[in-house]
Each structure stands twice: as C-alpha cells, then as structure tokens.
Amino acid sequence: MNGRTQNLWFSTFRLVIVYALFFAKLCFGQEECLRGGCYPATGDLLVGRENRITATSTCGLKERTTGVCNNCLHNTKGTNCQLCKDGYYGNALLGTENVCQRCQCPGGSSGNQFSNTCELRDVGKVFCTNCSEGFTGTQCEKCDNGYYGNPLIQGGTCKKCLCNGNINSAS
C-alpha cells in the first residue's frame, strides 16, 4: 500500500466511524434495537411492540420501517400476526405452523360451518361464539326454536318452520 492509498483508506475508515457514531443508534447491555430505538430485551417477544421474526414465526414479510407484518402466515392476522384469523382459534403468539386451528361449528365429517368465530374456553373445549340464525349449541350443532333440520349431516342445515303456530318442538 503506497502513501496515497493508505491515506485514502484511513480517511474512508474515519468517515465510516464518524457516521456510525453520529447517526447510528447504538444499544448497550440488555437492550435491543428496534425501529430506530432501544428497548429492554425480553427474549422472543417485545411485549406490546412486535412478535420478532424467528424460524417459527407467523410473519412472512415484515415492513422494515414500521415493523408491521404484511404477510401473516398459518391462519394468523394482526399488525404482528398475534391473533388467529376469523374462523380459527388458538394462541398465535406461539408462532408455530399449526397454532391456529379451524373452528368446528359443527365441522367434523359434515364439513358444515355455521359460525365464523370460536374460542378456546376450557382445556380442549372450543365454543362457537356467533352461530348463524337458526342454529344453537356450543358448536352450532342444533336447530334453534322455530327451526328444523340436522346440521350434523353433510349439507345439513336448519330451516325456518312455516307452521302457522303449530309447532311440535319434540319432533
């Protein structure tokens, strides 16, 4: 390296160092850099800020400047893919592939869906929270009063009774 090349190299190096010290935000100790600021490191989740991208993340593409996810995966939704989509239930914050399961309202072998939302209330018990008109039960598996049919069979539904007030709810 001759004197001129060496001078140019040192000048460039000094410029990079000055730029880094003047413009860059440096985080120290137990902090993590996120969107131009430093925040306490909390492991895989920055609580209230972002679900960090990991190998098992539910976010496929994150907006670099805002940190908002533009491509939620595995039936998730939300700015950080922290919720299950309508029609699915589970804990999306776990970030695994099958964390959000399809609601069974009543679902199963009938394939029928009569609620677009459900939630996990007790261990292993899913409750459908918005049964369509004419359907009732924890899985929308029964016809409501004034309706008849069998929602548990494939293609089954509940139809409004047109019985002029002559209803035998036992049949």
UniProtKB/Swiss-Prot annotation:
SMART domains: EGF_Lam (SM00180). Keywords: Basement membrane, Cell adhesion, Disulfide bond, Extracellular matrix, Glycoprotein, Laminin EGF-like domain, Repeat, Secreted, Signal. Glycans are attached at residue 130. Its main location: secreted. Residues 66-102, 103-160, 161-171 form the Laminin EGF-like domain. Residues 1-29 form the signal peptide. Transmembrane segments: none annotated. Pfam families: EGF_laminin (PF00053), EGF_LMN_ATRN (PF24973). The keyword Secreted applies. The keyword Transferase does not apply. One of its GO terms (cellular component) is extracellular region. It comes from the Eukaryota. One of its GO terms (biological process) is tissue development. CDD domains: EGF_Lam. Gene3D superfamilies: Laminin. Disulfide bonds join 59-69, 72-81, 84-100, 103-118, 105-128, 131-140, 143-158. It is found in: Secreted, Extracellular space, Extracellular matrix, Basement membrane. InterPro entries: Laminin/Netrin_ECM, LE_dom, LMN_ATRN_NET-like_EGF. Binding to cells via a high affinity receptor, laminin is thought to mediate the attachment, migration and organization of cells into tissues during embryonic development by interacting with other extracellular matrix components. Laminin is a complex glycoprotein, consisting of three different polypeptide chains (alpha, beta, gamma), which are bound to each other by disulfide bonds into a cross-shaped molecule comprising one long and three short arms with globules at each end. This is Laminin subunit beta-1. It comes from Hydra vulgaris (Hydra).
